Amino acid sequence: MTWLDKGVWTQEDENSCSFSESDFPGCRDQINPSIPSIWTAVSGMMISLEVRWWIKGKQGYVISLGHALSPRLECSGTFSAHCILGLPGGSSYPPASVSQVVGTTALYLVEEAWAEAGKMRS
């Protein structure tokens, strides 16, 4: 996914981090996991945008990918209300359209997160 190359880094699991920028060393020592996540799952694919705050005056946004068993849009977090939007069986949305919407939404969230992280670093 090329939008991960914008300087947003990925977290493969709780014990490993990989970055596309080199100015955030020691990620495991600096991540505060108490900040909420936004989960988007449509057509069996789940994209997780996890917002992480960094100690020592730096911020980061973590993207991770996974799989979901049922198509749904789920948002939850400490600062946002819990909501679930289910896609009904026999939906008129073709899979390509659903994927496009999810991809566009994820890209927007990543771009917003990256813009905010850039403001905090300057």
Swiss-Prot record:
Q: What is this protein called?
A: LMO7 downstream neighbor protein
Which species is listed as the source? Homo sapiens
